[in-house]
Amino acid sequence: MAAINAFYAQSGGATAVINATACGLIQEARRHHLADPTRIGQVYAGRDGILGALREDLIDTSLESDADIARLRQTPGGAFGSSRFHLGPLATHRAMYERLAAVLAAHDIGYFFINGGEGSMGAAWHLSQMMREIGQPLRVI
């Protein structure tokens, strides 16, 4: 059984707190991968947040050392870039959600983590609805 990969996006104002969250997420994914390689595979970060997924501009965090990932806890700004790009509602922006679904499928991504505010949570909800509608499994957090 192949591992399911994860996608992480930073959204909104980039702060050291967002980087600390990215650090924890990547470290925990690595821990789970070591315990059971079929559970979770690579963690991809979107360059400039959700725009990275739309452009298929993904950063493979498995190429970074454990020490570099640990340094994220103390790194100011958004390490992977961020944006305030708003996806909008599914009803009027279906093509963008379909593009996201295609990119996620191409990279075997089954976990989608978005770190941001209210707009990010709206996008996460719309994405989860789209994925459910098309029958593509995705855990959106």
In which residue ranges do the predicted regions lie?
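Alpha-helical scaffold segments in soluble metabolic enzymes
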Residues: 20, 24-28, 42, 71, ...
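N-terminal phosphate-binding or glycine-rich loops at protein starts, especially the Walker A/P-loop
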Residues: 1-57
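Short, acidic/small-residue loops that bind anionic groups at enzyme active sites
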Residues: 128-141
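A short, small-residue-rich loop immediately preceding and capping a beta-strand
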Residues: 5-11, 110-119
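Glycine-rich oxoanion-binding loops at beta->alpha junctions
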Residues: 55-112, 119-121
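General beta-strand structural signal in soluble alpha/beta enzymes
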Residues: 42-47, 80-82, 114-116, 123, ...
